[in-house]
Design a protein with these regions (language model features):
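Substrate-binding N-lobe of the ribokinase-like
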Residues: 4-32, 38-42, 84-168, 391
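Anion (oxyanion) recognition and catalysis
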Residues: 115, 150, 230-231, 293
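Conserved phosphate-binding/catalytic region of the ribokinase-like
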Residues: 1-56, 60-63, 277-392
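Conserved phosphate-binding/catalytic loop of the ribokinase/pfkB sugar-kinase fold
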Residues: 152, 157-162, 169-218
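Cofactor-binding loop segments of dinucleotide-utilizing enzymes, especially the Rossmann-like FAD-
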Residues: 53-55, 134-138, 173-175, 183, ...
């Protein structure tokens, strides 16, 4: 298998044995005061470092009237990508005096949450390394993103595309419902040369996290990074991101899932990957596993109020073992402000305890607890005096 990226040097080495194809200190950036218990022995840690590739985005968030989404052809609870007919939605949001500019994007939200839950501090943490890989434009949005990452203790490995603008996402909120309008600009333009020039830094990480949204334009980079990490016997984590993404890029998701050790999805995304509807959970997992290369693989699946399922495929026996179903704590409807970022925060909380080597029960509890905090705020942000205890 050879790289299709058009440069003599590939992201991965050929291997015939491989059979897989000024900083804002406002509430938006406030570090929570977290009480947690680290493993007594670092030998218990599953992962010391994590790098994620995805779309660095600034969310432009504002309350809107109900008729605004009809005006621009948007849908509550769904994502519609920006085009000429709906790009005016951003001006509609910015007319609101309470509009907020929040560093966001699925992977950025997850990494910042993970770092917060690990109690990481900018430039001081010697135990863990968390890095975001991507691309931005040369503008004020880039500065906002880098400031937010650094304040959370996350390193940036962000290519600067001078002639493009940083990606943005319009977030309209009305009666606790939301609509999303991402405009993916510079983040789609990351160059393979930038990846190759930074391979040493990338190789220093124990695990790779892939944002499903990112494969839309940069699938080859994702595939080759997956192969490189697997050749080095490192961990690959894949998020499915959205039902329409799995529908549109089904074969690509299947190939990336073949490399993955952990697959993160909600129930609807899992059904789309299995090409089955209304099946029992066990049947869905088995159907998916039959489509993939036989290897150890974890599934972490969120299903709203029905909780979180963690399941493990035993390739030697050809069976699917359900490890647990974790339930979120109920949140009063009047306390819910914005559901945007809840899933990202869940994954961040889950991964923080996974890195520490904690039980899957502890991982799910952390994810659910953090998501419960996030939905009480606008975007993936924490209140000033946020405290949480992740002890088993």
């Amino acid at each position: 298998m050879s790289s299709q990226l058009g440069r003599k040097e590939s992201i991965y080495e050929e291997d015939d044995s491989d059979n897989l194809g000024q900083k804002d200190k406002s509430i938006l950036y406030t570090n929570p005061q977290i009480k947690y218990i680290k493993s007594d022995s670092f030998e218990k840690l599953r992962l010391r470092s994590l790098i994620a590739i995805g779309n660095p985005i600034v969310d432009i968030s504002s309350n809107i009237e109900e008729d605004v989404i009809d005006k621009f052809g948007l849908k509550w609870g769904e994502t519609v990508f920006a085009n000429e007919s709906n790009v005016g939605f951003f001006k509609e949001l910015e007319k609101n005096k309470n509009v907020k500019y929040i560093p966001g994007g699925s992977i950025q939200n997850t990494l910042r949450t993970c770092a917060w839950c690990l109690g990481m501090e900018p430039g001081r943490d010697k135990t863990f390394t968390i890095t975001m890989l991507g691309a931005t434009g040369k503008d004020s949005y880039r500065n906002k993103i880098i400031d937010a990452l650094h304040f959370a203790g996350v390193k940036d490995l962000l290519e600067c595309i001078p002639d493009k603008e940083t990606s943005r996402c319009g977030v309209g909120i009305c009666k606790k419902e939301r609509c999303l309008l991402p405009e993916i600009r510079a983040s789609n333009m990351i160059n393979v040369d930038f990846i190759i020039d930074n391979l040493k830094k990338i190789d220093d990480h124990d695990a790779l996290l892939l944002e499903g949204y990112f494969i839309q334009e940069r699938y080859e980079i994702c595939r080759d990074l997956c192969k490189r990490f697997k050749q080095k016997r490192k961990t690959v984590i894949l998020t499915l991101s959205a039902v329409f993404m799995v529908q549109t890029y089904y074969d690509k998701f299947i190939e990336l899932a073949n490399y993955s050790d952990l697959i993160i999805a909600n129930k609807a995304e899992l059904e789309e990957l299995a090409k089955e509807k209304d099946k029992e959970n066990k049947d869905l997992f088995i159907k998916i596993s039959k489509k993939l290369v036989k290897k150890k693989r974890l599934f972490i699946v969120t299903d709203g109020k029905k909780g979180v399922i963690v399941a493990k495929y035993d390739y030697k026996r050809g069976t699917m073992d359900f490890i647990l179903r974790g339930f979120p704590k109920p949140v009063k409807s009047e306390d819910i402000v914005d559901l945007n970022g809840a899933g990202d925060a869940f994954l961040g909380g889950f991964l923080s305890q996974y890195m520490l080597g904690k039980s899957f029960e502890a991982c799910c509890k952390a994810g659910n607890d953090v998501a419960g905090i996030i939905i009480k705020n606008i975007g993936c942000t924490f209140p000033k005096n946020f405290k949480i205890n992740f002890a088993d």
